[in-house]
Amino acid sequence: EPEFISLSRDHVHVTETEHLVYQVPDHRRERALVRLLEVENPASAIIFCNTKAHVHFVSVVLQRFGYDADELSADLAQNERERVLQRVREGNLRYLVATDVAGRGIDIPDLSHVIQYELPEDPESYVHRAGRTGRAGATGIAITLISGITDKLALDRIAKRFGIAFEERALPTDADLEAVVAERVTALLEARLRERDSIQHERSRRFAALA
């Protein structure tokens, strides 16, 4: 069931959010992230990392896989930061990769997903991150990648402190990915066929009027 969480001190609220957890090998986090993005296919997402180096790495990986992704960290020059923020304001950026500090104060309307590439060092930051999605009665999804017993214990402490029911899931398999891709290709082809039929119908109607 969706969790109802609020952190009123900073006006952060999570109205209805699913909290999903994926256990992944630490050295394959980026591959796991790409796999999840393929299956979840969010319209927009913030991907949180703990360090500026990880923000840059994840952003580059996503771009190389063809995703519309950009980064936001303290290392960015002011003009680059403004460029990224402008894309966010205009709704022209699909995936924003950011640190907690750089992402503070950024509001993306109708954000469906928050993805935590790694658990935050401060447990309270989890609620701040997850609070970016599931607003105004909408259902949001907060995904967290964890690796090893240390992460698992940290997650348990977050669950206990904030009363969050995490749902642990297995990563999508190759078969899952193939099924998702096939479904999207089929939907695309059907949409194009409907569009073609609609155009042909309109042409027939016009020619009939000329006869």
Task: Say what each PLM segment does.
Residues 1-209:
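Conserved helicase RecA-like core
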